Every structure is written in structure tokens, then in C-alpha cells.
Amino acid sequence: MRFLKAKAGLVASGAFLLASVPVVAADCALPSTYSWTSTGPLANPKSGWTAIKDFSNVVFNNNHIVYASTTDANGNYGSMNFGTFSDWSGMASASQNKMSFSAVAPTLFYFQPKNIWVLAYQWGSSTFTYRTSNDPTNANGWSSEQALFSGQITGSSTGAIDQTLIGDSTHMYLFFAGDNGKIYRSSMPINNFPGNFGTSSEVVLSDSQNNLFEAVQVYTVKGQNKYLMIVEAIGSQGRYFRSFTATSLGGSWTPQATSESQPFAGKANSGATWTNDISHGDLVRTNPDQTMTIDPCNLQFLYQGKNPSAGGNYNTLPWRPGVLTLKN
């Protein structure tokens, strides 16, 4: 998500009723090459907004809960959530709820160890900030803002942006980008979360600006002892995602599907006809918790796209939601 500054009681027991997914006999490995089908644009922004973008999605009680950034005609950013809906066809008619604070480039998840929902975002009172809630469907039911990360990065025109969070059995990890060809990581013991990761981070990937631009996401791959990272890149035909894998969240990352001609997701393999860009979004997770678990047997990707003829200032581009479904 690029920005040039001129960017009650749902969990009483901690038990989840998740959206039904097809039952499979065995776990699936990640494919070596990806091919998708795509929906068209699933919703238009309500009056006053030019775009809905930077999606974070969980499935809870058989419904999607989606948070997103918004922009207006002047390039000002805000944030919103959708009213819940059970399948993607319901997104168009779901309510669009403006938030009283700006949670730009949000990450939404349920932190199971402390039975609390967490919403993390950028451009608050610290480099990254978070709020907590017992009811993630209520766009304006969040706690006061707390610092998530207080560090700074160098060699970046935007500073640290596009955070994501993920946990294993012992630690929580913060990953983020900087529109500068680098992906960064910080960590803390899981017992200290939610809290402030502090000021220190390390570079875990380094490449050209175009190859590692923004919108990093990290997931646990169900049944595979593996983690998947996706990063948005700038290509000759639009935005696309490159993928990397690791066997430890604290370890090194190996390129997986990283070319524009054979990406994780992009114009070359998305199946989308309404957009050339496959941009900032979230893979659909198997549960809402901090493990950020995905199932390659049933993989979908909520992304932002736009009409290829739309141009001008990035911050006023007409981004809309779409969903990719992996061909198995």
C-alpha cells in the first residue's frame, strides 16, 4: 500500500464456529506453479470514497469479517469494515462502516492465548500501533491505541509500512516493508503479546525496489511444517505477488514463485479480466488465530484490483476487492 505524504461477546468461550470448507482426505502441498480463477470486482466504495483497499479478512462464525483502508478524491486515507457476509457474493450488499480512527493497512486476527481480538495498523501514534476488542464486527468498538513497534528504517521514502503479524508456539513475529526492496522482521516472546516489539528489526529479504515493494503477508501452511511469505512487486504489466517459503519464522526465506511470468499471483496467472494488478490483500485463513494458517487444498486470495485504464495519483486510484481461487 503505497502512500506519498502531500497514507459483544463473540469470543465468550474462545470456541469458534468456522465457515464450512470442503473436507479433504489429506493435506496439500503448495504448488510449484500457481494458476487461479478470479471473480470480478466484488464491491464498490460507498459515496465519498474512491477506493477500498489493503484488505485483512478472517472467517468467524461462518462469516467473513473484512477490514480495509479507504481513500477519497483528495488522496486522504481512512479505514472501514464491512458488515459480515457468508460468501463473497454478499460483499456487494454488505454495509460499509467508517471507522472513527484511521487503521490504515490493517491486520486483523484473534490472539488465542489471551482470548482477545487484535487490529494492527500504521500511521497511528507509533510506527505501528494496535487496538484490542471482544467484538471484531464492531468497527468502532476497539480499545485505545497502543504502540506495536517504535523503530524506524533508513533508505525508504515511506518509512516502515504494511505490517503483518504471525505467531508460532513460542514467539510473535512482526514483518513489514518499506517500498525499498527490503522486508523486515522483529519478534517477541508470545507471552509478552500484545505489546511493543520495541525499536529493533532485521532485514530478512533484500532485492530491487520493484521486486520487494510492499504488502508483505506471512502464513503457516497447514500440515506442511512450512511458512509462506508473499510480497507485492511492481511489474511491467502491473502489481503482482512473489512468494517465499521457510521452515521457521525466525529463519531464512527461499524464493518459490518469484518471476512476473510465473508469479504467486499476477496478470500472468490470475485469470482476472477486469484488472491487470493483483495488489495488497490477504489469503483466506482456516481459522482467525495468530498462526495465520492457510490450506493449499482450498486456497483463496482477497486482493485489490483496478480498471487498467485508471491512472493518475496513486492515492486516488479506484481500487476494488476481488477474490482469486487456486486451481487444484
UniProtKB/Swiss-Prot annotation:
Domain of life: Eukaryota
Reported uses of this protein in biotechnology and industry: Synergistic reactions with other polysaccharadide degrading enzymes such as lytic polysaccharide monooxygenases (LPMOs) are important for industrial applications.
The keyword Transferase is assigned to this record: no
Keyword Signal found: yes
Principal place of residence: secreted
InterPro entries in the cross-refs: GH62_arabinosidase, Glyco_hydro_beta-prop_sf
Gene Ontology cellular-component terms listed: extracellular region
UniProt keywords, alphabetically: Carbohydrate metabolism, Glycosidase, Hydrolase, Polysaccharide degradation, Secreted, Signal, Xylan degradation
Family: Belongs to the glycosyl hydrolase 62 family.
Name of the protein described by the UniProt record: Alpha-L-arabinofuranosidase C
Species assigned in the record: Penicillium parvum
Lineage: Eukaryota, Fungi, Dikarya, Ascomycota, Pezizomycotina
Gene symbol of the encoding locus: ABF62C
